[in-house]
UniProtKB/Swiss-Prot annotation:
This is DNA recombination protein RmuC homolog. Involved in DNA recombination. GO terms for biological process: DNA recombination. The gene is rmuC. Keywords: Coiled coil, DNA recombination.
Length: 477
């Protein structure tokens, strides 16, 4: 009996345990479902949190950009207010000058009117005085009246002429001063407009994109080249397109020609956005960040320019380095002052950093090298021309010596011929003159001096032989 109760009790306990187990399993399933829902909610919460963080970061960036643009707008507004103040001051000065000009013109017109009235009154008084004088001295001789009137009116006429000249000189001087003042005001307005345009261009260039900054750098580079004395198209060329292969070309900003066929390339596409932030920022932390970005921009441009390898371009006999031009002098100085090792880093990439001042010194040196080269070439040409001239003179001297020898030979032949003609025994002149003594008639005789000298040296044997010949009938009478 007790065993049956024990077994029944065990069955009851087993059923209770099974029920408890089922309840526990149901509780576990419920807890697992709850856990899954909680995990899903947790993942959704994390996703929402990440979205919120992203939105927060985007909003923070927008706030920073908004603050940056607000600062830029404030700076531009300050510049605009300053420019407006300058314009207002200049307009006030212009109004003041205009008022002074108007007052001067009115005063001049009043002076002119008073002078005309005075001249008219003086003329009337002179006429009345002349009339009274003529009336009082009407019975005097006309010549005496005329002389007296001239003596009386001549000083007054001279005074009037001098007064008129002074008035004319005063008007002329005032007109010239008015013209000069107007010209200076116009120049002041033009200078103000030019300064405003240049300031606006510089601001746009520093705040613009890389293309705009590159164009600004090329403008500054062109001014430095112009100041150096080099000539475009002769000692330097701009925007030369160099063909590398069938599909690619490179176009350096400037190629400067050196003596002896060498070249040097100048690049002017430096970005100065970070330097603009450094220059305009008033916060030291922002200035430090902008300065580091400026240095990083310099290093990046050095590496990019080194990869272009301009000094190895085909058709160029370039030096082993390229000049990297930084168009704003303070941007160059602040970088070198902060990190002097930038110069050595650039040289390792075959790059030499230059500012407007250092580039101008280098270009002036190149100008002097070209001047010396031209002088050397001129000296070489002079030496070549001198050598050719010396050869010409030598040939001329040789020809003159040959001509002298020919003249000496001709003179010797002349003397020999003259000796045969009029000197010595049996000379021709003496023989033909003997024909005259024999009665031969001639139209014109030979020169008496030559004939006398020839006859004196002529031997009488010739005459005897000639007489014998005559007796023999060779020369009949």
């Amino acid at each position: 009996m007790s065993q049956q109760r024990t077994k029944a009790q065990q069955d009851i306990e087993r059923r209770l345990l099974e029920q408890a187990l089922q309840q526990a399993q149901q509780s576990i399933a419920t807890l697992q479902m709850t856990q899954q829902r909680n995990e899903q909610q947790l993942r959704q919460s994390e996703l929402e949190q990440r979205n919120l963080h992203s939105q927060l970061a985007a909003n923070s960036e927008k706030l920073q950009q908004l603050a940056h643009w607000r600062n830029e707008c404030e700076q531009l507004n300050q510049e605009l207010r300053a420019q407006r103040e300058i314009n207002s001051a200049q307009e006030a000065e212009l109004r003041e000058v205009t008022i002074r000009l108007e007052e001067t013109r009115l005063a001049t017109e009043e002076k002119q009117r008073l002078l005309l009235n005075s001249e008219q009154r003086l003329t009337t008084q002179f006429e009345n005085l002349a009339n009274r004088i003529f009336e009082q001295t009407g019975r005097r001789a006309d010549e005496q009246n005329k002389q007296s009137l001239d003596r009386l009116l001549l000083p007054l006429r001279e005074q009037l002429d001098g007064f008129r000249r002074q008035v004319q000189d005063s008007f002329g001087q005032e007109a010239r001063e008015r013209h000069t003042l107007t010209h200076e005001i116009r120049n002041l307005q033009q200078l103000n407009a030019q300064m405003a345009r240049e300031a606006l261009n510089l601001t746009k260039a520093l705040k613009g994109d890389n293309k705009t900054q590159g164009n600004w750098g090329e403008v500054v580079l062109a001014k430095v080249l112009e100041a150096s004395g080099l000539r475009e198209g002769h000692e330097y060329q701009t925007q030369v397109s160099v063909k590398i292969d069938q599909t690619s070309r490179m176009q350096p900003d400037v190629i400067v020609r050196l003596p002896q066929g060498k070249d040097v390339v100048i690049d002017a596409k430096m970005s100065l956005v970070a330097y603009e932030r450094y220059f305009n920022s008033e916060d030291d932390a922002e200035r430090e960040v902008a300065l580091n970005e400026h240095l990083s921009s310099l290093r990046g441009h050095i590496r990019m320019l080194g990869r272009k390898d301009y000094q190895q371009l085909p058709g160029l006999r370039s030096l082993d380095y390229v000049l990297m031009f930084i168009p704003v002098e303070p941007a160059f100085l602040v970088a070198i002052d902060r990190q002097p090792e930038l110069i050595n880093e650039a040289l390792q990439h075959n790059i030499m950093l230059v500012s407007p001042t250092t580039l101008l010194v280098a270009l002036r040196t190149i100008t002097n090298l070209w001047r010396y080269e031209h002088q050397s070439q001129n000296a070489q040409r002079i030496a070549e021309r001198a050598a050719r001239l010396y050869d010409k003179v030598r040939l001329f001297v040789d020809d003159m010596a040959s001509l002298g020898q020919s003249l000496d030979k001709a003179q010797l032949s002349y003397h020999q011929a003259m000796n045969k003609l009029s000197q010595g025994r049996g000379n021709l002149v003496g023989q033909v003159e003997s024909f005259r003594t024999l009665g031969v008639e001639v139209k014109r005789p030979i020169s008496p001096l030559l004939a006398e000298k020839a006859c004196a040296e002529h031997q009488p044997e010739g005459d005897l032989a000639l007489s014998d010949d005559a007796e023999s009938g060779a020369f009949p009478e």
